[in-house]
Amino acid sequence: MKALKALAVATLGTLVLAGQAHAQAQQPIKVGVIFPLSGGAGPQGQHVTQAIQAMATIINESGGVMGRPIEILSRDDESTPAVGVSRANELISSGVSVIIEGWNSPVTLAMQPVINRAGILDITAISKADPILSGEGNPLAVRLNSSNSQDGAVIAKYIADSKAKRIAFLTENDAYGNGAQEAIENELKKMSYAYEKVAEEKFPFNQADFRVALTNVRSANPEMTIAINANEGLGMPALIRQAKQSRLPGQLVTAVGTVAPSVISVAGDAANGVIGADIYFPDVEPFASNEANKKFVAKTQEMFKYTPDKYMALGATSLQVWAMAVNEVKSLDKEPVANRIRGGSFNGTIFGDVKFAANGQLESNHKLFTVENQKIVVRPVSN
């Protein structure tokens, strides 16, 4: 009788443990997402968050991550470093396995050491400042968007190819904006390209009135004005409209990745003729025929009635690559997942077959474009 009781207790214990293991296996994996959801960049941050939710749905429909569903926990950083740090701490306390963040470089740079100390993988989707990958705030940093250095080479080449000599800068006065301008000028110097910087105007991220700055630039009679403004919801559309109203001479060239369809929608006809460059266009090859991209675009349109732009694609790909890495290394731990991504290659992403540099930077292909009839028209590749 005692033996039977012992066997029954042991069997019950085994069943309880098995039930607990099964319950744990079915518990969602929490993914933290931090972007501006209010203020000037709020609309874009909301779109990026929606894109990540669309990708989470695609992943969950395909079996999830290590057999578990993904749950997205989203927070608003309000484009403010201190708020971003607070939101990061909230997500850390909530038990997230990874945090996908980064619209504004100053916010990303403030959050990095906090997330790193918590032992959680931090993936920067969009913020561009070069120090993000310096290793100071996060020795295992990963970034999807192109860097200021990569972008600077693209804009510098366009300046040189255009043979423009009188150059003006309208630059956001923070880590992103100053770094972007510095990268362009450094590349021009490397090319030994002779030019004159006829005007330079700096402004804060939240500025929306550029009339005084544009008056100063206009009086310098530039052949080309480089506009560096990451406030796509408010600042960049306002700058484009006011540049048109001021009859700014020469070409208006925008920093890489700062003119999306949402910017053109707000700027209206004033956007026609603007030059820009980017790394993703949903309906242009090689993206148009990419099955992973087609699936992502269709799911985003189904869920949110919106065609994704570059920012949304970067957010979704951040989650997609993380999920691929976790499923491969079979661990949620920061170090093995980060080491799989940094210096690694991934096939079948939204961006196609991709490769990350050893420092965590996704390698990108840039395309120049012109805005015509309020549409982005990709320019032919020049040698």
Name what the model sees in each region.
Residues 23-29:
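Cleaved targeting-peptide boundary
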Residues 28, 43-50, 58, 65-132, ...:
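Beta-alpha junction/loop-to-helix N-cap segments that form part of ligand/metal-binding clefts
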Residues 85-86, 130-133, 138-247, 286-291, ...:
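Extracellular/periplasmic Venus flytrap/periplasmic-binding protein
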Residues 1-8:
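Bacterial N-terminal signal peptides that target proteins for export
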Residues 17-23:
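Sec/Tat signal peptide C-region and signal peptidase I cleavage site
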Residues 29-51, 75-82, 103-104, 170-179, ...:
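Extracytoplasmic "Venus flytrap"
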Residues 299-312, 321-375:
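Segments of small-molecule ligand-sensing domains
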Residues 240-316, 372-382:
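Extracellular/periplasmic periplasmic-binding protein-like sensory domains
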